[in-house]
């Protein structure tokens, strides 16, 4: 009977029936079964309930209004050069367009008819369909999921987007031999058509139409025109399969620049472990981590080389292991890349004008780490505090209860033309401030370390000119990294040094992948929404429904966004730090709620349930990710020659780290056979295959090449292509964009700002003749090396040794981790207060359970209470204790829920104003009772 009850709803997830057509009694129950079946992510996407029109927003605007006639048998024939172009709009409307309006282009000679009746699309109903009981079926429940039969959605690996079979992009591809396989993926259905088109394009008698989508022309044009590609159809299919495989394998991979949930085990399983995870921390660093786990607002200071970056990486891993959502950010892109995070502006949604435009996402984290905080303006810092308090509805709680961990050195490069945050009252009074003292970088050169400490506070050390080599003014050292004042001079110096080298240059272009979800989520709901639909109100209702049976941590994200002109997509982000049982429970409850949404008067109707959210991003998401990728220091074309000097921009081994310098000695073919054995793993293998196919198929390189670099440490290795990711945070609805490129850059010259936070391995030269006096500039430049033998400088002037007096005073007042005042007066973050309360209740519950077990053992060993045969007061006492124990466990869950409800009430009261405060409190109190 239960199987028959579940079967209709289970068929929804497999056979393409709309959720709204389910019997209401089984809608919320039967959908649970979908979450328990194995999902074939290789399918690109499995689709349910094919009533919702797909395609981009522009494509939807071209759709006819509901009720228009769309089933005429008008036909556009593709057979001659003049009539080759099918106007997609005309085909979709069922109207044959005049040939003179079509652009000149040549298509395959085979006659291909596209009938509007064959690609018709059922218009959206004005109201949900009537509920009809479904005939009971006994289809298979276990095993491979059955694919839907009526889907109009297709995953296009060429563009990385979901699209409709009636969309312009799909009709364009269908006209040249593409089709849809049984996994609802785009594939080469008619290879002969593609081969014939390629032959004609190579002869110059055919071309792809100029009005086709640019992404399709760019993806196919190079392969179809490349004479070295013997079978273009097979090459295109291979290229699409590599994109899909990469998407599948990296679905749960950690985002390298992620602001948030990075799964440690996934990194280790990926092959190359993060060396910062296994690094040995000194005693001082361990104490700082333990202090941070107490939940206080913190500032971690210290001079250059005291291990702040290593500490932040280890702290982030430790906090994530505790189940916390952590945002790793920095005020500069270079520093963000170095610590494995992103910029503060991107992560927190700060506009160019300094406004926080994504306020509703700021409470998505339990802790936010900000590196290089010396470059954070006081005004932005205080605005960040104000916005978090406002969003949390807690005006008296610093940063709304979110733990803020700041790191940096105010005696290094700071913010320009604005006061630093040391002048902020909140920073001075609410933050636990400590200073790291153990020197790590210059540990083997105490005299040089002492000289740097004097420069740090604005003093000119007597031993400086004696320990550092002095060169004539205007000197450029060919064998060194030259630190110059401006980016223009740096680019000019790098280009000139490269031109001086003999031989041909090799330009290696980075491969930019497809936008995708690389995290764990629930299924995605596609909803038809009304004009007055409000995302914030809907999210509140959805969270309320989910929390009816499953407790959702405050930082867990309900992702809801507009994807069509009259539709939204909704899913729940599942942090890897949460337990598997919790994630499974959320998946089940989410599908139950999907069957309840249509009964609520909130302006939304669920029309599709899609297990995978890949390809459901918006053009705005993609544009944002493309802008971020364009600014990434590694995702730029790299021109190299034999003999050129390069800087490693990632960590390959314990000895080859970010900042290592070497020389390109050769180029070899891009293949796994040439990759060092120590670096071979599944992750590198995917990057090599992806980059090789990209260079061959899309760039037209006859032989994809990789550089062989001899580093100053003595190691000579083939540097493999590396994957870099941007995005993966609430601003982009957790979508990420990946790029595979060479983790190298020319290392003849840099600005001082670009190397702040790095340890340079090799010779470094400072050309000071064109540098203007700037506070802390000389100290930052000279502290990039481990010993004075690496360093040389020219045009040194003692007047350039400058330090800000207020920053020097602040630094001297900092305490060490062993000499802190009482922490009782400092605020504690919300996650810590909640954890302490729950821990206390659970400890009481554990004690009661232990007491009951001991009582049962006295009466009969490990026999259950029900089988003890007790009677009278003893039996009544034990039964009462069992009831109390169950109630106590229930109280634990209610306490967690009440804390979150209290936070929501405070936020609501702050918004509604003082006039409605009393009314809101009364109603909230009644609801709690």
UniProtKB/Swiss-Prot annotation:
A GO cellular-component term linked to this record: mitochondrion
Region (Disordered): 55-89, 902-929
Cofactor field: Mg(2+)
Residues binding ATP: 302-309
Subcellular location: Mitochondrion
Transit peptide: 1-52
GO annotation (BP), single: DNA repair
E.C. no: 5.6.2.3
Biased composition (Polar residues): 74-89, 916-929
Keywords, alphabetical: ATP-binding, DNA damage, DNA recombination, DNA repair, DNA-binding, Helicase, Hydrolase, Isomerase, Mitochondrion, Nucleotide-binding, Transit peptide
Reaction(s) catalysed (UniProt annotation): Couples ATP hydrolysis with the unwinding of duplex DNA at the replication fork by translocating in the 5'-3' direction. This creates two antiparallel DNA single strands (ssDNA). The leading ssDNA polymer is the template for DNA polymerase III holoenzyme which synthesizes a continuous strand; ATP + H2O = ADP + phosphate + H(+)
InterPro entries hit by this protein: AAA+_ATPase, DNA_helicase_pif1-like_DEAD, P-loop_NTPase, PIF1_helicase
DNA-binding region: 776-796
Residue runs in coiled coils: none
Comp. bias (Basic and acidic residues): 56-66
Disruption phenotype: Essential, it cannot be deleted.
CDD domains: DEXSc_Pif1_like (cd18037), SF1_C_RecD (cd18809)
Any Pfam family matching the protein: PIF1
GO terms of molecular function: 5'-3' DNA helicase activity; ATP binding; ATP hydrolysis activity; DNA binding; magnesium ion binding
Subunit structure: Monomer.
Family statement: Belongs to the helicase family. PIF1 subfamily.
Function: DNA-dependent ATPase and probable 5'-3' DNA helicase required for the maintenance of mitochondrial (kinetoplast) genome stability. Essential for replication of kinetoplast minicircles. Involved in the segregation of minicircle progeny.
Protein name: ATP-dependent DNA helicase PIF1
Origin organism lineage: Eukaryota, Discoba, Euglenozoa, Kinetoplastea, Metakinetoplastina
